Amino acid sequence: RICPRIWMECKRDSDCMAQCICVDGHCG
């Protein structure tokens, strides 16, 4: 699944946080 590219959006999404590395304001 594609996670939000904006870090704050990723941080609000626990599923995304479990799957993504969020750095420098972006999710990758």
Curated annotation (Swiss-Prot):
MF (Gene Ontology): serine-type endopeptidase inhibitor activity
Any Pfam family: Squash
Is Disulfide bond set as a keyword in this record? Answer: yes
Which locations, inside or outside the cell, does it occupy? Secreted
Recorded GO CC terms: extracellular region
Query: Which residues are listed under the site Reactive bond?
Result: R5, I6
Q: Which CDD domains match?
A: PlantTI
Disulfide bonding pattern of the chain: C3-C20, C10-C22, C16-C27
Top-rank taxon: Eukaryota
* Gene3D superfamilies associated with the record: 4.10.75.20
What InterPro entries does its record include? Prot_inh_squash, Proteinase_amylase_inhib_sf
Q: Which keywords label this protein?
A: Disulfide bond, Knottin, Protease inhibitor, Secreted, Serine protease inhibitor
Name the job this protein performs.
Inhibits trypsin.
Record-stated family: Belongs to the protease inhibitor I7 (squash-type serine protease inhibitor) family.
| Notes concerning its domains | The presence of a 'disulfide through disulfide knot' structurally defines this protein as a knottin.
Q: What is this protein called?
A: Trypsin inhibitor 2
Source organism = Momordica charantia
What phylogenetic lineage does the species belong to? Eukaryota, Viridiplantae, Streptophyta, Embryophyta, Tracheophyta
